[in-house]
Amino acid sequence: MSSIFSCVSHYKTLCFGNNQFVNVNELQQNLQRTFSFSDDFKCRRLDVGGKHCLFAYIDGNIDKILLEQDVVRPLKNCERLEKPYLQSLQNTVAYADEIEIVDIKDSPQSVASCDVAFFIEGEDNAYIFSLRKPAARAIGEPPTSSVMKGPREGFIEEIKTNMSLVRKRIKSPDLVVKTFEVGRYSSTTVALMYIRGVADEKIVERLSHKIERIDVDGIVDSAYVLSFIQTKKNSFFIQAGTTEKPDVASAKLLEGRIALIVDGSPIAITLPYLVFEDVQDGYDYYSGDWRASMIRMFRMFGALFTVLLPAVYISLQTYHFQLLPIKFLMTLMAATTNIPFPPAIEMLLVLTLFEVLNQASIRMPRYFGISLSVVGAIVLGDTAVKSGLISSPSVLVVALSAIGIFCVPDQVGAMSILRFLYLCISAVLGFVGVIILTIILVAYLSSLENFGTPYLAPYAPRISPDLQD
């Protein structure tokens, strides 16, 4: 498909220029010259009511049955095609409400966008029919967001379907949708959705301006758009929410956020993003207030546990062992006496091995990933401990840290980096280094803003009404 858009971009001015075509023969030659490198481009001649007409489309991207039954067949039976042509077509074909008029020199772009272009001899406009094939994937529960309670619908790779899933939940004329065509060759549709009167109009304007300024060859996923709209691109903390569930996107819209839906991607982007969204989950709203609050506290504790546990272990073992009870200290010394590596190097090796196994299990096929996890966790870990290369307390610490990291799955990358940073500074300065890095981290998070919204809101600064959720 990229070669098609390349042809359109290169030949559109050469073939069409600013002149109206003379007849259908000339138009067909120009179109065939424009798409000369694409074997799937098709032209079809048709006489309608005494007028010479032409269809142009990309084979494989349109529903030929709909084209034949609902467009071509009614036009063949049309006795007279008169001006205004749009009204005549609307009175003839079944897809009357989906006819769009474009200038003839812009018609190759519409054809490359998987639509059907219809030309009438002597007319300087093209009439566009949207007859794309229906989505190949049915709406179902997204694999990354399975739930025990709640809606199980998920976004798919078709933008119109995704927008309708949101509109099904927010039936209001104040739900605004702005569309953009992004990508020099791909011309990918990006939909910006927000609720008028709830979302901040300044953020909407700023985000719209960022999208309009995107200059790239193509957009094939929402992650491409995200890389252009981030306020701080070098931060390892995520700055935008992502979801595959229309109910989550709708809930965030009702809270005043903005959603971006990209054609071809099942993942919607929500902005502005706050760090405390990481501990929120749709299942919380099916629990009582106290229970949901406790669950979120456990998630926050799990995140802190993940980041700090290896650093605290190294600090206690290396610098502050006098803080440990005597029996615990003797047990720890007995387990680590014959290990050939210093504690910090040992912990670094175990953490690195875990990250390698984790990345390998993610990228391997599902069934092999399970086998790899068993081999890595049981065989390699047990063998390394029995051979005396690493100590059992180090394996236990890394295992506990690995469990806690998935309490905030959206921040797994940031948690992994912070865990290594805390480990390195604790190996040099002990608890003093942990405290210093914590102060720096809190100051850094306090300085972050996401489209003018503080990253630590509603706690810093404190916004009392927003604390209710």
Predicted regions mapped to residue ranges:
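Membrane-embedded alpha-helical signal segments
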Residues: 1-308, 312, 323-326, 445-469
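Positions that flank functional sites
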Residues: 185, 268, 372, 399, ...
